[in-house]
Each structure stands twice: as C-alpha cells, then as structure tokens.
C-alpha cells in the first residue's frame, strides 16, 4: 500500500478470503493506493532487503549477505561450523549497496568492475529509485572492495557507469 510519495507502508497481510474484500475496500476508502510488483520491488531495494533467488539462495552465506542478525548461533544448524568461522574471519565476498553517480539503471546480472576495469562482482538487484532520483543496486564484490565510499563501475549496455558503495538501507524514511 502506498500513501503519497515518501509515506510508505508495505505489508504482506494474510486474511481469510471472506474478509479480504472488506479489508481492501476499507484501505482504499481511507486513502491507500495500491502498488504493483515493480513498485514493491523498488521499495525492497531502497530498504536493502534481499530477494530470494536474486540476492540470496541456498548457497549464500548469511555473513556474506549481511544477514548475521537473523542467524541464531545458539542453536545447531547445517554448516554452523563454517558460518561461525566466517563470522570470526569474514568471507571473500560481501553484499553491498551502491548508488550510480551518472544516469543509468543497474539490473540483475550486470558486471561490477573496479576503477581499473577488473571484474569484482555482479549486480543482484537494481532499480531507479524515485526517492533518491538515482539508479541504485545491490551486488556481491570481493571484501577488499566492499568499503563504503569506494568507487566502482557498473557495466550498463557496454558502458562503464561510475557508482559509489554506500551503506544500506539506501532510503531512510523520516
């Protein structure tokens, strides 16, 4: 649900079918505006949230993805010893956010390069941010490149577009 620009509240709600239409109509009658999947995806990226299949999958380390906060280390789980080691010493790659310094829209699968032109990673999610009025994205880069403020290049249609690594989330609601 979207209420005017910069006043956003997105929630997935599960309700019995018998009540769904009444709840929907109540939201609309009170000024809420529906938004589509693309709008929801843009808001997800602005918040730095991962999408399974894009930003994370079964092979993704929660440490590399920046998801240590949702990993319960007091309980046993598959590969706990490996994840604990990564927690202690770090991972080779890290998920980062970046903001384009030039016009362009980063998309999943686009290459990330350092300023010397060396391959350093790949875009996992990207969009044009209406809140920031810039192209933004997330991706994985080698940990030596995963420093807030570092400049990188995103390859968009065979053109190198300068971007700056930034902290997540991209957008902070006021």
Segments predicted by a language model, with ranges:
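Short beta-strand-to-turn element immediately C-terminal to the catalytic PLP-Schiff-base lysine
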Residues: 13-16, 113
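Beta-strand->loop->alpha-helix junctions that form or flank phosphate-binding loops
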Residues: 34-43, 121, 166
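Single conserved hydrophobic/aromatic residue that forms the stacking wall/gate
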Residues: 1-10
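Glycine-rich, small/acidic residue-mixed loop/short-helix segments
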Residues: 60-174
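Short, conserved secondary-structure transition motifs
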Residues: 37-55
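Structural signal for hydrophobic packing residues in well-ordered secondary-structure cores
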Residues: 27-32, 49, 53, 87, ...
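Internal alpha/beta scaffold segment
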Residues: 15-40
